[in-house]
Regions:
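Aromatic (phenylalanine/tyrosine) cluster motif
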Residues: 7-10
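A cross-taxon signal for low-complexity, glycine/charged-rich
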Residues: 3-5
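Conserved, well-structured ligand/cofactor-binding cores
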Residues: 20-195
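Intrinsically disordered, low-complexity polyampholyte segments enriched for Lys and acidic residues
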Residues: 13-16, 25
Length: 195
């Protein structure tokens, strides 16, 4: 079962990639519905490209989340992980003049993974899973961040992510820091299958 799958339309005919060779791939829309395991595997295997919803409602949802965080920052509100540390450091407030620097510093701090690197397929699964989570509209991220993750998947520019590193409630801070590091140009990536 592939959820959210659409086919590119040429005139009156809907076609899939098998009908026209390697010219295009089917597109999986990520954001309005949860992805199935089969969806994640298909994107990881590069059987599908991904896209974000075009609906006004979805785009407004994403913008409202980002606007909410921006307003809370202007009001100098306390936002876990934005104006505070993470985990046991959640009670440590970050001075407002350092708030914009915190995400970069946290990605560097948590970039302490060990072990073998995840293979390209597994790293792609990590990226599409995070994209799906963020694109649901509950995280306050910008549309431009989501668009960059879509670009990474569709262009097959995927962060190199070590296989070991996180322990904790979510267990994902270390691997996700490698996505953030790649987004700002500070981490290695797989480009066309090679590091």
């Amino acid at each position: 079962r592939i959820s959210g799958l659409i086919f590119i339309s040429f005139g009156q005919n809907n076609v899939n990639a098998s009908q026209i060779g390697s010219m295009i791939k089917p597109i999986l829309i990520v954001g309005e519905q949860p992805l199935s395991i089969e969806d994640v595997v298909a994107v990881a295997r590069q059987e599908f490209n991904v896209a974000l919803p075009e609906t006004t409602e979805w785009r407004e949802l994403i913008q409202r989340g980002a606007d909410f965080l921006d307003q809370l920052l202007l009001d100098e509100g306390v936002i876990y992980g934005v104006t505070t540390g993470y985990g046991d450091s959640c009670l440590v407030e970050i001075p407002m003049h350092q708030v914009n620097e915190l995400p970069l510093q946290l990605s560097r701090f948590h970039g302490c993974g060990l072990g073998e690197n995840l293979d390209l397929l597994t790293a792609r699964a990590v990226v599409v899973t995070r994209l799906c989570s963020l694109a649901r509209g509950y995280s306050g991220v910008s549309l431009s961040l989501l668009e960059r993750l879509v670009w990474m998947l569709n262009e097959n520019i995927i962060p190199v992510i070590p296989s070991e590193g996180s322990v904790g409630a979510s267990g994902d801070l270390t691997p996700l820091s490698y996505i953030a590091g790649a987004l700002v140009g500070e981490r290695d990536v797989y480009a066309q299958g090679k590091i």
